[in-house]
Curated annotation (Swiss-Prot):
This is Four and a half LIM domains protein 5. One of its GO terms (biological process) is positive regulation of transcription by RNA polymerase II. Keywords: LIM domain, Metal-binding, Nucleus, Repeat, Zinc, Zinc-finger. Interacts with CREM (via the third LIM domain). Interacts (via second LIM domain) with SPAG8.
Length: 284
């Protein structure tokens, strides 16, 4: 009885009594299979032959003996590892080179463990705690001070000021007026109720007013131009009897020369320089 023939799919050499490899149900001699189908090792660039173990990670292949940490050269076979810039690193080397350090305990935050980030620093989840109650803050609201981070209840208990207007806690910013704290959004003109936090303002009987309201309600009016005399920014004004003038408005009613620092004469509600007033039946 004739023995059936069994050939390599590629080179057609007989495979009887020889090792072979099946690929898509087709037989290949070992040399043809290695030449045609073998992957190339990422490390040594040699083919990974059919008799060798082929280790694959993200489409790249290694011989078992080449699958090592690129920094310490220890084998990564059946060990945890991580990739950094296409380099494979064992857990220890990755931690030393790439992992963040906890801002509190200064120890490495291991890959895969949960970490908290705040203002560019990192913490172990168990190290990111309220400075007062020592409970983990996690993703809950917090308030930061130079002395540390605080959960909202502890901050309110230890540090918070209460707004003089709404009586609620001031958690950040705020304004002090008459030694009393205010939310910026609560510090309003007592007349028109607009916010004063970015405005110049005046006060009357301990109440704040924007300049428009204060001038309208309380400022004296210039006897010449009738506009308010505010006295802001060191503005100068002249008082005589029961009348006031802006210094730039205190001029002779006839020739308009400035009378600031000069002698003057009056007639009814007019003021004159001595020259112009000499021909007028003046009061002085």
């Amino acid at each position: 009885m004739t023995t059936p023939q069994f050939y390599c799919q590629y080179c057609m050499a007989s495979l009887l009594g020889k090792k072979y490899v099946l690929k898509d149900d087709n037989p290949y001699c070992v040399s043809c299979y290695d030449r045609i189908f073998s992957n190339y090792c990422e490390e040594c660039k040699e083919p990974i032959e059919s008799g060798s173990k082929d280790l694959c990670y993200k489409g790249h292949h290694w011989h078992e003996g080449c699958f090592n940490c690129t920094k310490c050269n220890h084998s990564l076979v059946e060990k945890p590892f991580a990739a950094k810039d296409e380099r494979l690193l064992c857990s220890e080397c990755y931690s030393n080179e790439c992992s963040s350090k906890c801002f509190h305990c200064k120890k490495t935050i291991m890959p895969g463990s949960r970490k908290m980030e705040f203002k560019g620093n990192y913490w172990h989840e168990t190290c990111f705690v309220c400075e007062h109650c020592r409970q983990p803050i996690g993703t809950k609201p917090l308030i930061s001070k130079e002395s540390g981070n605080y959960c909202v209840p502890c901050f309110e208990k230890e540090f918070a000021h209460y707004c003089s207007f709404c009586k609620k806690v001031i958690t950040s910013g705020g304004i002090t007026f008459r030694d009393q704290p205010w939310h910026k959004e609560c510090f309003l003109c007592s007349g028109c109720r607009k916010e004063l936090c970015e405005e110049e303002f005046m006060s009357r009987d301990d109440y704040p007013f924007c300049l428009d309201c204060y001038n309208h309600l309380y400022a004296k009016k210039c006897a010449a131009c009738t506009k308010p005399i505010t006295g802001l920014r060191g503005a100068k004004f002249i008082c005589f009897q029961d009348r006031q003038w802006h210094s730039e408005c205190f001029n002779c009613g006839k020739c308009s020369v400035s009378l600031v620092g000069e002698g003057f004469l009056t007639h009814n509600k007019e003021i004159f320089c001595r020259k112009c007033g000499s021909g007028v039946d003046t009061d002085i």
